[in-house]
């Protein structure tokens, strides 16, 4: 039986409940939904990267990347990405940011992806992203 390893990096905010930012079991790594919070600073409440979709999207992608790396993975190991937006009006901008980010990252093959509008994010947050990676 392969051991399950919870991943919560020091750079991330402490989860508000009993969950981790990612879990790896064998060659499978699930990154929990990440939002655009800036890296954790002791004594500071979780702080969004900024009020704009651009700021939050880029920080959210970096937060997903850091969990992938903590689990020994990278973007090319990702099989599925799920994006949750709070406003249908953000689709075009998010797609442009997403495409530019992955072009800059040198992604070889695009993973499957799904974007959903979800209004249940905490106030001020515009985007959440999770990812499923298979290593090897």
Per-region residue spans from a language model:
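N-terminal presequence-like segments and the immediate start of the first folded domain
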Residues: 1-62, 66-80, 85-136
């Amino acid at each position: 039986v392969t051991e399950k390893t919870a991943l919560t990096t020091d750079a991330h905010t402490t989860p508000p409940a009993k969950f981790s930012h990612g879990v790896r079991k064998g060659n499978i790594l699930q990154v929990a939904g990440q939002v655009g919070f800036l890296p954790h600073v002791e004594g500071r409440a979780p702080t969004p990267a900024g009020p704009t979709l651009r700021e939050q999207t880029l920080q959210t992608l970096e937060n997903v990347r850091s969990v992938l790396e903590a689990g020994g993975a990278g973007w090319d190991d990702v099989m599925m990405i799920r994006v949750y937006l709070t406003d249908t009006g953000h689709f075009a901008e998010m797609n442009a940011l997403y495409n530019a980010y992955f072009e800059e990252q040198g992604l070889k093959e695009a993973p499957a992806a799904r974007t959903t509008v979800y209004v249940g994010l905490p106030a001020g947050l515009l985007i959440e992203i999770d990812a499923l990676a298979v290593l090897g």
